[in-house]
Amino acid sequence: MASSSSTQLPWSAWHARLHHKLLANPDLLPAKASLLIAVSGGQDSMALLGLLIDLQRKHGWSLEVWHGDHNWHKQSATIATELKNWCESHNLSFCSDQAKPGQTNNEATARHWRYEQLTLHAERLSSNNPNHPCRYVLTGHTSSDRAETLLLNLARGTDLAGLSSMRQCRPISKDHPHKNVQLIRPLLGFSREDTALICSELGLPIWLDPANSNPDFSRNRVRQEVLPVLESLHPGCSLRMAALAERLNHHHADQQAIAMLALNNLSKQNGLCRKDLAQLPITARTTLLAYWLKRSGAPSLPAVQLEQISQSIAPGKPPGSLHLAQGWKVQWQRNSVQLEHHD
C-alpha cells in the first residue's frame, strides 16, 4: 500500500484529540500497522480519512482506502470514480467493489456485504505482504451512529449485548473471529456535528449519498425524525446515549467474565450441576444458560425460551428436555443439565 501525502494543514484540536486517544490506547491502531479504511465519501468517513492522512507521519501507518458501491442509485458509480481520483491525487492506494443487483436489498444485507468484502481485501493485503499483514479495518462510525443503534435496538427489543453494540473494537467477522481481522471505530468519541466541522476546516470533499435520505431505511428515519426531536428537548442527548452504550459495553464485558467463572464452577463432566444452578435466582440462571449455550457453540435462544429452560430446572421440577435449532437439544436430569448435538 502506498503512503499518502497531502498539503499539511496546521495541527488542529481535532488532530490532537484523536492523536491523544490513540496514545492512550496504543493497541487500538498500533504504530506502523497496515490499515484498511472503509470510505463512503460521506462526512464521517472523509473526516476519519483526513485525520489519518495527517497523523500518518506520527504513527507510521500504511493506508489503503476501500469503497463499497451498493448500486442503490445512478450517481453511485460517479461517486466511486471521483473518490478514486481524489485518493490517487493524495497518493493513497484505492480499491472498490460494486454490489450486484439484489445483493444489498436492505441495511442488514448491505452491512453483511460490506464486511465480507472488507475481510476479503484485508486477507488479500496480508497475503501480498505476509510480513506486514492487514489486521485493522476502520470505519467512520461516530457517537451519533451509536445513539441511533441504541434506539433502534431498544425499539426492536434486545438484551444487554444489543444495547451495548457498536463497540470500538471487535472481530470484523462474527462467524469467523479466528481470522484475526479487527473492526475499529476510532471516531466513536466524535459526533456527526464534529465530523462536519472537521471536513470544513480541513477542506475535505464530501460526496452526498441520496440513499442517506431514503425513508425506507429505518436508520435514516431515526436520524432525520427521531433524534432531532430528542435533541430539541434534551440538547446533547446523542452524546449521552452513546456514553451510556459505552458503559453498558463495559458492564456486559464484566458480566461475561463473571459468568465464565461461574460456569467453570458449575461445570461437571456431563454438563452443568443442576442442584447448584437451581439455587441461583432465575435471572442469574437465565444469564448463565445463555452464556453456556454460546460457549458450547449452540444457537442463541430468544429470551422466552431461555426463561422456560431456567424455570424448568428450578428446585422440585421434573426432568425434561427442549429441542433447539440445528440439531441441538438441552435436557435436564436430576443432577445435571446437558447439551447434545446431532447432525
Swiss-Prot record:
It is an enzyme of class 6 (ligase). SUPFAM superfamilies: Adenine nucleotide alpha hydrolases-like (SSF52402), MesJ substrate recognition domain-like (SSF82829). GO terms for biological process: tRNA modification. InterPro entries: Rossmann-like_a/b/a_fold, TilS/TtcA_N, tRNA_Ile_lys_synt, tRNA_Ile_lys_synt_N, tRNA_Ile_lys_synt_subst-bd. ATP binds at residues 40-45. Belongs to the tRNA(Ile)-lysidine synthase family. The N-terminal region contains the highly conserved SGGXDS motif, predicted to be a P-loop motif involved in ATP binding. This is tRNA(Ile)-lysidine synthase. The lineage of its organism: Bacteria, Bacillati, Cyanobacteriota, Cyanophyceae, Synechococcales.
